Design a protein with these regions (language model features):
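Core nucleotide-handling region used for phosphoryl-transfer chemistry
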Residues: 1-186
Length: 186
């Protein structure tokens, strides 16, 4: 299951991703797609599993704590309440990026801690929900999404064009973005 490919803006990172990106781009040729900005922060997931709310970093299920940045974002965005309201009696994960002061050198350049979603995952069926389902959930529940670069009906970009897009993309703070993520529209 291909989930997305990052095109890094630095040349060394791009070379490391080249083979993976090329294969993924070939699979996506002619298919509907979405391109978003890669936020430079830390992976953060809010989830409901069997009625219990939890917060994870990329590799750890975190204990609830007001001192933990991940949990502070969950509280600030009322993630538990919003997920349970929108997906009653379902096991769902909202995957996103935590960024801001104290996170990965704050390369985005914001003044406060922030979260933006990039995936919805149905835990029971083990499948990612569509871009439109993510968009509707985030709109209805006022949860920020990763910045959208482009949505299209037929992916036909060359690797060089994708690199150009990634190299010139900026965050709203005018800092150069970490890169782009390309996904099937589903």
């Amino acid at each position: 299951n291909w989930l997305g490919t990052l095109l890094d803006t630095d040349q060394n990172g791009l070379k490391k991703q080249m083979k993976k990106t090329l294969k993924a781009a070939q699979k996506l040729q002619g298919k509907p797609f979405v391109i978003t900005a890669k936020m430079d922060g830390s992976s953060c997931t809010f989830f409901i599993k069997d009625g219990t709310f939890g917060v994870c970093s990329r590799t750890m299920n975190l204990k609830p704590s007001d001192k933990n940045s991940f949990w502070r974002m969950a509280y600030e965005y009322e993630a538990e309440k919003k997920i349970k309201e929108y997906f009653p009696n379902k096991n769902i994960a909202v995957q996103g990026e935590l960024y801001g002061p104290g996170i990965n050198k704050n390369r985005v350049g914001v003044t406060t801690l922030k979260f933006c979603a990039f995936n919805l995952f149905d835990i029971d069926s083990q499948r990612y929900l569509s871009h439109s389902e993510l968009d509707l959930f985030c709109t209805m529940k006022q949860i920020p999404r990763v910045p959208l670069v482009e949505i299209g009906d037929s992916f036909n970009y060359s690797l060089e064009k994708l690199q150009e897009i990634a190299n010139y993309l900026k965050y709203e703070t005018n800092n150069i973005a970490e890169g782009i993520v390309i996904r099937p529209l589903q």
